């Protein structure tokens, strides 16, 4: 299957999705959700891109981002994955006696023949990236993200899931991760 063509440039909104290796439910943990969001916020400040929407699901995250002159998705997503992949295995190893941490370590362990950069892989290698060219598509992607926790049966309504931009847009709650507005 051929790779999808990516169009990077200023004034292009991107819908991105990255998944945890083997679809492990790493983000069932508030600790890792919080660390991920803090890392994303720090990277946004460093690279000056905008976050228009997101939802953090147990095994993946989709987001709408507006790249900056300093960084497009081909730099943003790998940087985010690299930074989180450093602290997550260390944190799991420090708490490996806890059953959940032990299961996560097992799920993220690579076979011995592929230990190129360490014994664990946190993220699947690639990420999905779609240019969002219209307001209709932007709203479609926001609605998809905000509805995802409800569709998966994790909550009964989007406002009950704190790890989403829904609360920012509809409740004025920016306590988890403030969103950037498009001008």
Tell what function each PLM region has.
Residues 1-183:
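Short catalytic/metal-binding and nucleic-acid-binding patches
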């Amino acid at each position: 299957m051929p790779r999808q063509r990516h169009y990077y440039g200023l004034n292009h909104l991107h819908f991105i999705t990255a998944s945890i290796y083997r679809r492990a439910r790493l983000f069932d943990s508030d600790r890792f959700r919080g660390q991920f969001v803090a890392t994303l916020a720090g990277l946004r400040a460093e690279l000056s891109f905008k976050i228009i929407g997101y939802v953090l699901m147990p095994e993946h995250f989709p987001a709408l981002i507006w790249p900056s002159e300093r960084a497009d998705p081909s730099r943003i997503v790998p940087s985010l994955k690299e930074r989180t992949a450093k602290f997550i295995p260390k944190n799991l190893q420090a708490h490996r006696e806890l059953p959940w941490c032990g299961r996560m370590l097992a799920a993220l362990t690579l076979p011995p023949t592929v230990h190129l950069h360490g014994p664990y892989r946190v993220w699947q290698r690639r990420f999905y990236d779609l240019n969002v060219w219209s307001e209709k598509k932007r709203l479609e992607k926001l609605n998809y993200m905000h509805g995802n926790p409800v569709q998966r049966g994790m909550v009964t309504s989007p406002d009950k899931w704190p790890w989403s931009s829904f609360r920012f847009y509809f409740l004025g709650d920016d306590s988890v991760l403030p969103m950037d507005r498009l001008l």
